[in-house]
Amino acid sequence: MHVNDNLQQMAYDTFMHSFFRKESNGKLGDIIVENAKSPIQVGDAKAANNGDIPFFTSGDAVLKWPEALVTGRNCYLNTGGNADVKFYVGDAAYSTDTWCITASGEMSDYLYLLLLSIKPELNQKYFQGTGLKHLQKPMLKDRPIYIPATKELDTFNKTVQPWFDMIASNVKESQSLVALRDWLLPMLMNGQAVVED
């Protein structure tokens, strides 16, 4: 979805323009708020794959789940394999191998873009292990970061949050259209519905 990609790129560019190379004044752990660990295995979600709640995994696929574990503005990080960071606004669920976090003080969008900006560093420095690499959460929480002042954050959020809200709205609308297509297409194919001029 090109519109969503463009909105995300605009948000990222705004973050980089506003905060890149700012001197550290805190640690990542100062702003992170951890959501509860999910009891849901990816296999269970793949088998069910029903409902209308997005289900985030440590892979690229976003599955479906019948009930939300969280709501609001949340980041979803892989805990094994390779670093990846996803962001979603609204009700969502996630697998046991996904670390779901948000941020204190209206900093969730900032947190997501910060993590996205250090994604190569996440992969190289904070994923360790001999076989399957795992995210080293304590090390990541100890990473120095710039924590914006309230006025800076307000200005940033007024610009960026509507873009992420629009992305979430576009995703939900696309899902509704896919559901309508999946319901209507079989009816058209077997003659239960016809299209008239």
Regions inferred by a protein language model and the residue ranges of each:
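Non-catalytic DNA-recognition/assembly elements of restriction-modification systems
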Residues: 1-59, 150-196
